[in-house]
């Protein structure tokens, strides 16, 4: 009986320990992800004008291609 009590107590201790380790890991991962997200967000804002210009250019190219394909069909 004492063996079962010890095993049960040890099992509870290990569950608690794993939960604490998981929370610690989660907190450290969240802190690293928040720092990476902040750096990525700053880079995204810096790249926004370039991305916007490229997107506009690509839209223009698609529109020109569409207009040309429409003219080809009419002829």
From Swiss-Prot:
Q: Which domain of life is it from?
A: Eukaryota
**InterPro entries, alphabetized:** Glucagon, Glucagon_GIP_secretin_VIP
Task: Give this protein's Gene Ontology molecular function annotations.
Answer: hormone activity
Check the record and name the Gene3D superfamilies matching this protein: 6.10.250.590
Under the heading Pfam families, the entry gives: Hormone_2
- Location of the protein in the cell: Secreted
Recorded GO cellular component terms are:
extracellular region
Q: Which UniProt keywords apply?
A: Hormone, Secreted
State the family it belongs to. Answer: Belongs to the glucagon family.
What's the name of the protein? Pro-glucagon
Biological source species: Amia calva (Bowfin)
- Gene name per UniProt: gcg
